[in-house]
Amino acid sequence: MDVSENTIHGAVSWAHGKEIIHSFGGNVLVYGRSMMKPLMMKPFVDVLEDMSWDQKAISCSSHNGDTEHVSTAQSLLSESEWGLMQCPLDVPLIQFGRQVRRPRRWFHTCSGEHAAVLKGMRKMGMNRAGYTLPNSPWFPLYLDVLREYMGKPEWQPLRVAKDGCGFPTLSLIHISEPTRRYRI
């Protein structure tokens, strides 16, 4: 029998006025993770404007590794570029019966995003080696997009971490900050 195990860190906090009444789990950092995919693709909008709607969708979302999704993600790169992919190995999320597929990068939920970033970097003439690292040429462009959307030209992330797919993920706020913003 297969057992799926996950560890999730949760934090809850609430406020009255400016005072935090209760906080459980600590004043932890909140990371954008997959919800940031559309903003991560913004630096490449102009050079990727010729993509099909399916390709645009797979580049800004997560998928379950089915045949249609994998085919669309693969269509973003030439077969000779497939070896550049650095997302983790995975199996399709939905399989019936016995596990028969070996783990592949294309089955990973973020393979479309990885392929689109690689394609965008190629079209912009950027070096793609180490594209998943924060010192990659596209990363400062992504930070500029966030600064523009937040209206904070000097903003810096509190921390840069590695997401489960290998891309950098940013700590945007502490859990107490939205608590204060949405207080009653």
What are these regions (language model features)?
Residues 29-38, 167-171:
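Short, conserved micro-motifs enriched in small and acidic residues
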Residues 21-27, 51-61:
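Glycine-/proline-rich flexible loop or hinge segments
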Residues 16-18, 46-52, 81:
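Short, solvent-exposed loop/edge-beta patches enriched in aromatic
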Residues 54-153, 157-165, 172:
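Active-site-adjacent helix/loop patches that line small-molecule binding or acyl-intermediate pockets
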Residues 173-174, 178-184:
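Single conserved hydrophobic/aromatic residue that forms the stacking wall/gate
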Residues 10-13, 38-46, 116-120, 173:
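Contiguous, well-ordered alpha-helical segments that form the cores/surfaces of helical PPI scaffolds
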Residues 32-49, 68:
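Active-site SXXK
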Residues 1-29:
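Beta-lactamase-like hydrolase cores
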